[in-house]
């Protein structure tokens, strides 16, 4: 399930560290978090959609690795992002 371009652009502008920033860990993690929440809602209605469940697990793993990278490189940015996204940590 792809994100709508308008929603993705809104997330990018909200979490970007500078103009045109699409690759910073904050932006990537925010986009992944939105995709994860959308897929989670989809799976609540379609419990037997195992292909989507596998894709969701891959996205969760990718977000976990990005969060680990951010925690290793800049703990302050990591804590701010966790707080902002409302992720448990």
Swiss-Prot record:
Database matches in Pfam families: Ribosomal_S15
MF GO annotations: rRNA binding; structural constituent of ribosome
Gene Ontology annotations of biological process type: translation
Keyword 4Fe-4S in annotation: no
PROSITE patterns: RIBOSOMAL_S15
GO CC field: cytosolic small ribosomal subunit
Claim: DNA-binding is one of the keywords in the record: no
Disulfide bonds: none
Role summary: One of the primary rRNA binding proteins, it binds directly to 16S rRNA where it helps nucleate assembly of the platform of the 30S subunit by binding and bridging several RNA helices of the 16S rRNA.
HAMAP family: Ribosomal_uS15_B
Complex formation: Part of the 30S ribosomal subunit. Forms a bridge to the 50S subunit in the 70S ribosome, contacting the 23S rRNA.
The name this protein goes by in its record: Small ribosomal subunit protein uS15
Organism: Kocuria rhizophila (strain ATCC 9341 / DSM 348 / NBRC 103217 / DC2201)
């Amino acid at each position: 399930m792809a994100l709508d371009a308008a929603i993705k652009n809104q997330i990018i502008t909200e979490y970007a560290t500078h103009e045109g920033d699409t690759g910073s860990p904050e932006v990537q993690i925010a986009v992944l978090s939105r995709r994860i929440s959308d897929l989670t809602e989809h799976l609540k209605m379609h419990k037997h959609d195992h292909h989507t469940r596998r894709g969701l697990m891959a996205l969760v793993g990718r977000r976990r690795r990005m969060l680990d990278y951010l925690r290793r490189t800049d703990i302050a940015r990591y804590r701010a992002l966790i707080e902002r996204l409302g992720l448990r940590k």
